[in-house]
Swiss-Prot record:
UniProt-listed GO biological process terms: root hair initiation
Pfam families: HLH
Region (Disordered): 1-58, 157-213
Organism: Arabidopsis thaliana
CDD domains xrefs: bHLH_AtIND_like
Gene name linked to the record: RHD6
Protein name as annotated: Transcription factor RHD6
Length: 298
């Protein structure tokens, strides 16, 4: 396969035969710039076309081409695309060199830049490689022949990555959007159910009466605790026992004081202690009988 250059002042595209082939594929017409121009007259077009057709029948072949630093739309290959065959560069970098070579099992592709940087793509099928980059000869209405490349044959790595990355990014965005949407609804529903409601205690007459009764009992116990000797220093049960004993003692005292026998008349003789003791016992026994009778009747 022979590729041609559209600039007479630049180095021509030279085709070279692979080590496995013995036939020289270069055309003598490529030595002259005017004859190597693909869009020129009939002589140059026929030479390049014949060399191209001869090279397509070869199974093992390779080519080396050196594109110019300038970008023209009438060149052999479109170098403005986003593929790895893009030679659009700044003026500070030298024009890269691209070489393709084939072997019996496959081919390789690499291009070199002036800064000792090389990029290689290996393990390519030779037949597939030739199908991708081989041009078709077309004839213009003026009778001139030109090279035509189909957009479907251009293989790009950048566009492939760009076509895959938006899908993955879009899937991630849609996934996160779908996952966060139900969670928001769920959280809003839970918060709506768990809102604290104002507690309104009903005005129950029984509850109010029980509350008042407890308050009165507490007040009475506090008063009794103050009346019983040392009532504030003991617990409630002990305080109640002391209060009971104290009340009994007071009852006896009242009965003793109410008996006229224990109080002599003015100028009279005081009673004996034994008499007073017997009188107290009688009072206590009578009070005990009265208490027992009250319990039986109740």
């Amino acid at each position: 396969m022979a590729l041609v250059n559209d600039h007479p002042n630049e180095t021509n595209y030279l085709s070279k035969q692979n080590s496995s082939s013995s036939e020289d594929l270069s055309s003598p017409g490529l030595d002259q710039p005017d004859a190597a121009y693909a869009g020129g007259g009939g002589g140059g077009g026929s030479a390049s076309s014949s060399s191209t057709m001869n090279s397509d029948h070869q199974q093992h072949q390779g080519f080396v081409f050196y594109p110019s630093g300038e970008d023209h739309h009438n060149s052999l290959m479109d170098f403005n695309g986003s593929s790895f065959l893009n030679f659009d560069h700044h003026e500070s970098f030298p024009p890269p060199a691209i070489s393709c070579g084939g072997s019996s099992g496959g081919g390789g592709f690499s291009f070199l830049e002036g800064n000792n940087m090389s990029y290689g793509f290996t393990n390519w099928n030779h037949q597939h490689h030739m199908d991708i980059i081989s041009p078709r000869s077309t004839e213009t209405p003026q009778g001139q022949k030109d090279w035509l490349y189909s957009d479907s044959t251009v293989v790009t790595t950048g566009s492939r990555n760009e076509s895959l990355s938006p899908k993955s990014a879009g899937n991630k965005r849609s996934h996160t959007g779908e996952s966060t949407q139900p969670s928001k609804k769920l959280s809003s529903g839970v918060t709506g159910k768990t809102k604290p409601k104002p507690t309104t205690s009903p005005k129950d007459p029984q509850s109010l009466a029980a509350k008042n009764r407890r308050e009165r009992i507490s007040e009475r116990l506090k008063i009794l605790q103050e009346l019983v000797p040392n009532g504030t220093k003991v617990d409630l049960v002990t305080m109640l026992e002391k209060a009971i004993s104290y009340v009994k003692f007071l009852q006896v005292q009242v009965k003793v004081l109410a008996t006229d026998e224990f109080w002599p008349a003015q100028g009279g003789k005081a009673p004996d202690i034994s008499q007073v003791k017997d009188a107290i016992d009688a009072i206590l026994s009578s009070s005990q009988r009265d208490r027992n009778s009250n319990l039986i009747t109740n």
